[in-house]
Amino acid sequence: MAPWGIILIAAAAAVFLFVIAPALLIFIAVFYHKKAIPFEQYDLKKYQNHYYIPFLSRIAAAREWIQSKPHTRVWQNSYDGLRLLGDYYDRGAARTAILFHGIGAEMYTNVSAHARFLYQCGFNVLITCQRAHGESGGRWTTIGLREQHDVLSWTRRAEELGAEEILLYGVSMGAASVAYASDKLRGTRVKAAVIDSGFYSIYEQMRRDAHKNHIPKIMLPAQQVLARLFLRVNLKQPTAGTLARAAVPVFFLHGTGDETVECRWGKTNFEACASPKELLLVEGAPHTLSILHNPELAGKRLQGFFGKYFT
């Protein structure tokens, strides 16, 4: 074999070993079906530095409280044929809150406190399990991009269950799911939305995570290419783009102590939103935990917001 042929083979092997293979592994780790951390394992040594740890007892209490209420397991078909799981807490109200959790989260862990609060505010509560998580169908998550259509599917299901007024409440990836759906809500019974700890775009979030975890920058464009090829989504699509056409009032909630999604993205999304809007930055609150970090402040502001748009 000619020397140039050997060089080409060696170069191709190097590209595969040091770029393509690692990029594929990262892609699978980020987007493939999530086996959520069981709530009981958060107290193990492995998670001793997790930001949930100081809040575990309060999360457990909220989880136990909401799960003690009568509820029905429901299923909803997605636009692309997946079966999505939900738990419906019917308190006989005319208004229903639909909750959407974050990536990698077990169905209840990062929305239990929110569900309890909303139930106490007089809402029926529908807790959803996102696609490619837990018992819901799907092999791949798209961190909000396809999930936005699931938001619409669950909205229709809530209407079928008798909801006259609907609140959408998303945390983290769930917040992005709601944000991406925010311009598609005309003609529905959705009266308002809450975007809690929402990011700006998947690509920007991955850029931050890559820097924090010392992952080479070349992996980012590789993820964009792989997402385009295999998932048919654009990781650079900003939530601010759809919020600029938002069809319902939006309450933005973010903690200044959020080390997962920068607080500035909450401000950016708020500024981009075209519909009536409110912003609450909770001093020192970690990711998705504003409602537990300062329940008096967050609760008061949210109840005031609900009072404007729900009967």
Please report, for each region that a protein language model flagged, where it lies by residue.
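N-terminal membrane-anchoring alpha-helices
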Residues: 1-57
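N-terminal cap/lid segment of alpha/beta-hydrolase-fold proteins
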Residues: 53-92
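Catalytic nucleophile-loop/oxyanion-hole region of alpha/beta-hydrolase
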Residues: 133-165
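Hydrolase active-site cap/lid region
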Residues: 180-233, 243
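Short beta-strand/loop motif that positions the catalytic acidic residue
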Residues: 245-247, 252-254, 258
